[in-house]
Amino acid sequence: MASITNLASSLSSLSFSSQVSQRPNTISFPRANSVFALPAKSARRASLSITATVSAPPEEEEIVELKKYVKSRLPGGFAAQKIIGTGRRKCAIARVVLQEGTGKVIINYRDAKEYLQGNPLWLQYVKVPLVTLGYENSYDIFVKAHGGGLSGQAQAITLGVARALLKVSADHRSPLKKEGLLTRDARVVERKKAGLKKARKAPQFSKR
């Protein structure tokens, strides 16, 4: 009996409330923001790159505006116009439309000076037929060109403008023909031959 009373007194002396905590044990993890957060400089760079990709470059905006301008000036597209001419040179082909205006030249929806890289000779090629007849400030030139290089395209535009001016008046034929602006330049690069380095260049001959 004494052992039972001793056991009961020892159990009553224990306080479970003091040993058991009110909150369960919790494991603290670091916040996701602190682990994956970018440095301030890299975050700024990322935001700048995102804004740069969203905003379109000014060149594309100019092309879009010129496209709208050309469509407003040429209802129905190039094929529906009356004063039109096609010119060719080497591998280049140019479709030219003339409209009464102030002398603007637009090639592939870009300003001629920008498209021809500011080359004065190529810019002169484009306006030679108009200058010959004194119309350099009387017509706007709209061009769709493809194939070849810029030099070939500029010379193809020359022929296209001259042919388009014939549709304005048949009296233009004589002065344009006198300047050789209605002649199609049929010269193209000569093909390479087998056994030669180029079209005609041969390897050095050795007799012995």
Swiss-Prot record:
One of its GO terms (molecular function) is structural constituent of ribosome. Gene3D superfamilies: 3.30.230.10. Its main location: plastid. It comes from the Eukaryota. It is found in: Plastid, Chloroplast. Residues 1-52 form a transit peptide. Pfam families: Ribosomal_S9. One of its GO terms (biological process) is translation. One of its GO terms (cellular component) is mitochondrion. SUPFAM superfamilies: Ribosomal protein S5 domain 2-like. Keywords: Chloroplast, Plastid, Ribonucleoprotein, Ribosomal protein, RNA-binding, rRNA-binding, Transit peptide. Belongs to the universal ribosomal protein uS9 family. Binds directly to 16S ribosomal RNA. This is Small ribosomal subunit protein uS9c. It comes from Arabidopsis thaliana. The gene is RPS9.
